[in-house]
């Protein structure tokens, strides 16, 4: 599948923002089975400086410096992206959780996507005993890894309520777990913690999800959003496989990978520091459109 993605952010400030340093993680990092072309980043007003480079993880970071007073900042990211590969399903010969946990410890690779980076607790994904108790025997060492991880994703989908606005980017995973509700970010953190408690390399992924309008209704421009899911290293043969606990599925060609890190903090679409500005408001418009649905095609 080929998609055209537009991500537009408008920040408005109650009083002039005098100085800012922002990090943007909107450009898809290279990832197997996916390609990106025609990337464009527009910032209005133009920043004093902009620097773009790969990050420490599979993430691309654009750093903006703003040194003139402004009351509104508009950022638009656009690109064309192709997602390849067939559906992934559990196999009878998948390695067990115990075998993968041992293999991860033996890996010597220390590149951005090396499993070693994703084995341990991180700032937004502490290894909470209560999550381990909840999982119980669901991730026992003798279970085939892909089937067990899919069961976990489906359990989160069944037992946690998706409730937009009930949490935000700062909500601790412990709070979302205790409340049994939240959004994709919370569910991804819960699954990451559960998998790491079992000794498995689990990463947090930021990306986009293809959505469908209601039957008979037109696609609403700007109504899509970013999404979060989990990447699990399933051994050298299987490699990294995506699991979406919000929807209880293994990821497919409707999941568009942007960035991967230890938790949300590594891949946040935008963060930084600013001076002045007073109160602020955020307007976000996202479109993920299959190329075949665009007038005239590519």
Which role fits each region the language model picked out?
Residues 9, 167, 246:
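Ser/Thr-centric signal marking residues that sit
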Residues 13, 158, 168-169, 173, ...:
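Glycine-rich, flexible loop/turn motifs
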Residues 25-34, 39-41, 247-281, 288-290, ...:
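Glycine-rich, small/acidic residue-mixed loop/short-helix segments
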Residues 96-182, 198, 262-264, 279, ...:
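Secondary-structure boundary elements
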Residues 154, 186-278:
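Hydrophobic/aromatic-rich core segments of domains that either
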């Amino acid at each position: 599948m080929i998609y055209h993605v537009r991500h537009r952010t408008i920040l408005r400030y109650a009083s002039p923002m005098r100085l800012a340093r922002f990090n943007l993680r909107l450009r898809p990092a290279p990832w197997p089975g996916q390609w990106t072309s025609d990337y464009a980043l527009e910032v209005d007003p133009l920043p004093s400086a902009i620097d773009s480079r790969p990050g420490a993880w599979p993430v691309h970071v654009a750093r903006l410096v703003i040194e003139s007073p402004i009351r509104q900042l508009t950022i638009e990211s656009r690109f064309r992206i192709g997602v390849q590969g067939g559906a992934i399903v559990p196999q009878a010969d998948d390695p067990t959780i115990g075998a993968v946990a041992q293999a991860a410890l033996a890996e010597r690779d220390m590149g951005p996507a090396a499993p070693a980076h994703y084995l341990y607790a991180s700032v937004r994904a502490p290894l909470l005993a209560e999550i381990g108790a909840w999982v119980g025997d669901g991730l026992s060492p003798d279970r085939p890894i892909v089937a067990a991880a899919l069961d976990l994703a489906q359990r989160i989908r069944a037992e946690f309520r998706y409730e937009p606005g009930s949490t935000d980017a700062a909500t601790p995973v412990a709070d979302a777990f205790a409340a049994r509700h939240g959004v994709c970010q919370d569910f991804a953190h819960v699954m990451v913690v559960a998998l790491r408690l079992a000794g498995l390399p689990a990463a947090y992924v930021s990306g986009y999800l293809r959505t469908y309008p209601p039957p008979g209704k037109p696609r609403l421009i700007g109504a899509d959003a970013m999404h979060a899911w989990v990447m699990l290293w399933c051994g050298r043969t299987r490699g990294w496989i995506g699991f979406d606990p919000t929807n209880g599925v293994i990821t497919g060609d409707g999941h568009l990978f942007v960035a991967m890190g230890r938790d949300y903090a590594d891949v946040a679409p935008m963060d930084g520091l600013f001076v002045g500005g007073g109160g602020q408001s955020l307007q976000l418009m996202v479109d993920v459109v299959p190329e075949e649905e665009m007038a005239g095609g590519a």
